[in-house]
A protein has these predicted regions:
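C-terminal motif of bacterial Sec signal peptides marking the signal peptidase cleavage site
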Residues: 19-22
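Periplasmic-binding protein-like
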Residues: 107-118, 143-150, 207-271
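A conserved helix-loop-strand patch within extracytoplasmic ligand-binding domains
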Residues: 106-156, 256
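Beta->alpha turn/N-cap motifs
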Residues: 40, 67-69, 79-93, 110, ...
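Short, polar/charged alpha-helical segment
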Residues: 32, 39-62, 71, 77
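Short helix-initiation/N-cap motifs at beta->coil->alpha
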Residues: 63-74, 161-189
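Bacterial lipoprotein signal-peptidase II cleavage site
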Residues: 24-32
Length: 271
């Protein structure tokens, strides 16, 4: 699942105050933790972790749901939340840099894998010289798609381009593949385009297709992906007992099984 840095809205401070209203009391004991999550499917997964935490570790998990442009990093940094679960490392690094915060990743959760899909081929070896591959055009996902193509040995990227390479960083393209950049939401539609052999699509836009990343993809990210989602907290809180117990609860068989169902196979455990 992809989250990019959102723009600040004028009412953000007021809305945040309302959202966290009644949550001003700090809970520093080992038996309570307040965790920010994104409303919807991700909160459904966190509810399972909450149940595991109570039953196995006697830990009371208080979930605070977020949506729209309001994300959990600011209240985590300010101490209103103990931790959050919603982002991958590249997002956290970008957010820390932009805001001057020092939040840290303490555990992996799931990879919501980007993958290549096709209605014309079944495996990478069937790609022909000059075939067209459609990829997202926003910087984070464009870079992610190019790194996936490199993992499949279809292209080579210039060294030291990090997680945000662009098409100009391609230094080898043995099959002379044509890279077509477009808005992520449009990618599922080009699967039926006669000119496009493969479309690289994030799970964000899969719901309309009925595709399953593990079952239906030609190639896919694995759990070693740098885009694995993470549990995040403050530096001084990373070894706290409540954080450790929450990590164990989230990285449990019960949560993995629930995520498999909730995301229809679109969540790969990253631990």
């Amino acid at each position: 699942v992809k989250y990019l840095l959102g723009h600040t809205v004028k009412s953000a401070a007021l809305m945040m105050a309302i959202l966290l209203g009644g949550c001003d009391q700090k809970h520093d004991d080992a038996h309570h933790i307040k965790v920010g999550v994104i409303n919807g499917a991700e909160q459904d997964v966190a509810e399972v972790a909450k149940k595991v935490a109570k039953e196995k570790y006697g830990l009371e998990v208080e979930l605070v749901g977020f949506s729209g442009s309001l994300l959990p990093n600011d209240p985590t940094a300010h101490g209103d939340l103990d931790a959050n679960v919603f982002q991958h490392r590249p997002f956290l690094e970008q957010d820390n840099k932009a805001k001057g915060t020092t939040l840290v990743a303490v555990a992996n959760t799931f990879v919501f894998p980007m993958a290549g899909y096709s209605r014309k081929i079944k495996q990478v070896s069937e790609l022909k010289d000059g075939d067209t591959i459609a990829i997202p055009n926003d910087p984070t996902n464009l870079g992610r798609a190019l790194l996936l193509l490199q993992k499949e040995k279809l292209i080579t990227l210039r060294a030291n381009t990090g997680l945000l390479p662009t098409a100009v960083d391609i230094i080898a393209n043995p099959k002379r593949l044509k890279i077509m950049e477009m808005e992520g939401a449009q990618l599922p539609r080009v699967l039926d385009d006669a000119q496009v052999t493969v479309a690289i699509i994030s799970t964000t836009y899969l719901q309309q297709t009925g595709l399953n990343p593990v079952r239906d993809s030609v190639f896919i990210e694995d759990k070693q992906s740098p885009y694995v989602n993470i549990i995040v907290t403050r530096e001084e809180n990373k070894d706290a007992a409540n954080v450790r117990d929450f990590i164990k609860s989230y990285q449990s068989p019960e949560v993995a099984t629930a995520a498999e169902t909730i995301f229809n196979g679109g969540a790969v455990p990253g631990w």
